[in-house]
Curated annotation (Swiss-Prot):
Keywords: Cytoplasm, Elongation factor, Protein biosynthesis. This is Elongation factor Ts. One of its GO terms (cellular component) is cytoplasm. Its main location: cytoplasm. Residues 79-82 are annotated as: Involved in Mg(2+) ion dislocation from EF-Tu. CDD domains: UBA_EF-Ts (cd14275).
Amino acid sequence: MAISAKLVKELRERTGAGMMDCKKALTETDGDIDKAIDYLREKGIAKAAKKADRIAAEGLVHVEVKGNEAAIVEINSETDFVARNEGFQELVKEIANQVLDSKAETVDALLETKLSSGKTVDERMKEAISTIGEKLSIRRFEIRTKSDNDAFGAYLHMGGRIGVLTVVEGSTDEEAAKDVAMHIAAINPKYVSSEQVKEEEINHEREVLKQQALNEGKPENIVEKMVEGRLRKYLQEICAVDQNFVKDPDQTVEAFLKSKGGKLVDFVRYEVGEGMEKREENFADEVKGQMK
């Protein structure tokens, strides 16, 4: 099959491998990008791939905390200009509050709920679209709860480009919980701890690392030990509690929270537009679109 330049570019961005290596990997795997990543890793050409999610859409993430409940919300706009608009920022906060007040479980259910003004969220969104002049949409939200003996950590990076909500058990130190939220914003772990990693993912990683070691020409009798060592390192890279804490790399996140009497039990990290693709237009088409 013909391998498109766009696919090669994506594989290069995700693996850091050279253009010809990427093209060969895609050819060998019939254009399957995930298999091509494994191929490059097994050959020792690429490290573990970056997340596939391409950040393209605009908007804001907001975290709202009320007592023992907290909500994290993402609302999308078409342009970054609108995301910086004060009216849009107020709208995002208003919707986050409504998520907590309504206890809605889905976006569709949330849209039907009534605000204190008597309008539904759907009517409020349409009103904002009319005022701001751009398509706006509530993309997702999640609610977390805690006890009086626990703490929420809320952190917004770049004014809401990234938002993190952490739940720390056994400590009411909100500053420590926020510091861990900041760590998660920066490092972007996938899990709280290795206990959350599915066996399927561990087995897949183990197989890739085994092929990598064999392709390096390592004796089979030491391959297993090497694989387990590399697997531990991989798990450290994706699990928050095992990572070196960004504000104090001499200790892990787990050790930092333990010193405060707490333990990380949950987190939610939203990055605006992750997994979404912006419509691709060249400058000439953009100008034509504005002249219509």
